[in-house]
């Protein structure tokens, strides 16, 4: 007998081997029809998978996150199937699932056009409607290479040839199409009902710019039509909110080819930056951090000792001077350890919290650069906490509380927490990693937050807690991190004198809340569609005179507001007041003030809040109270 334990704890027994699909059928016809895959002892498998021993089994449907991934993965294969049907000379390469969709890379003699995408999508729908069965076959590596070479698929043959000889090769077949894949896939193409091809872009074979340029077709796929429509609506809204467009419209910043991935901040954009930095500086000081500054360029030897040279060199800018090799820092942590090491530290000095608005540079691929969101030169709200093991829990809780409070001030109240675990390429022993990972789990439990675990996503020197904020249109952005590092203090010789006079290694907590300033400002701009709250707005108030006779009064109001700390200016141009209002409204200024005879003679101001909300006339003192209240409430 084979016993199958289901997620609710119930057991079903079968006299012999049974497939996932057969188990689903035994539970109910509805579940059997909805089944897309199975999860056996945590491992995803096809519905055709044959169970030959006692296992824990969950039936995966489109209601599961895994189910959506199976749909998207299968739709990527459907895309390749359709392309091969329409363009037999095209060669297939790879087609993974990505956030909200999938892509597939093709080698073809000419660029795919928008008209081609329409034709391909139509063919995909036809193939899905045929409801062809998707089957898995197991091949030897060499036979699989011969199969794809015989079909003229040199890229696929190259991928398979790089797999160890003793490893079995999984191929999936649907109709006339066969492809290499680990799976799982939907049981038949009829399960794929909601999809759309989005765009085509260039991509190098194996991500290497020395290789051939391929064509990458992006698509999205969903379980329900309404989910796809909501996603497409979100994309339309995101297009309107694109921070690159807002940066140009509002004259905040620009980028240019002479400095790829580096930002030219204009006065108004820099004003936003300074508002954020001053706010963060105050919050950090209040939380017991000391601000420091470390060098931009440091000798290769330090990066070798820290482990960055071995694990991170491909992302570092390297230079040479007087026969010495240097690296421009990609992160601040080794520099902060040098400050910790300068002088003898006692347990009484701990926890020591060192913060730096540190300018870093990383050699990101040019194709990955994207406005403020992905740059080569950036500033982090970086800090490192040196503490004892006994202090980890309290420090993690304090940081968690600080991070949530700061996100709330910036208007982000939906925050998800994730724990990224050890990657394949890492420093330190498994014992150290076990200790570090469990330390963060314990700290998160103490914070009372729920979290999701991400295997393989940690930094090379330690696991990390990630803070993902959700914006106004439902997108998730990873900003803050808390990383527990037992490796770097060891490698760089950090130590303190313990209470018993012995020398001990401190625990090092790497932490950031905003991440990079550039990216966070891009997120802020898109979240607010450029209409930043008063405390962040580069121009908070514009006072507009109706005629020349009101210019002196308008100027005096502006100067009064400036003396009280507000970013105010006077527009005294000889233009129609409606023109001025429209112009400054497009600049998304929070408050527009109009002054004429009535306002001048009564020491009042006529106020319009952003969005053309007429607040009427009021004394200047009343308006100042409103500004102060908005500022205090971060509204």
From Swiss-Prot:
- CDD domains hit by this protein: TGS_ThrRS, ThrRS_anticodon, ThrRS_core
Instruction: Tell me which GO cellular component terms the UniProt record holds.
Output: cytosol
State the EC number(s). Answer: 6.1.1.3
Q: Where is this region: Catalytic?
A: 242-533
- Organism of provenance: Ralstonia nicotianae (strain ATCC BAA-1114 / GMI1000) (Ralstonia solanacearum)
In which residues is Zn(2+) bound?
333, 384, 510
Look up keyword Acetylation and say if it applies.
no
TGS domain sequence ranges: 1-61
Instruction: State what protein this is by name.
Output: Threonine--tRNA ligase
Gene symbol of the encoding locus: thrS
- What's noted on cofactor binding? Binds 1 zinc ion per subunit.
Q: Which proteins does it associate with, and in what oligomeric form?
A: Homodimer.
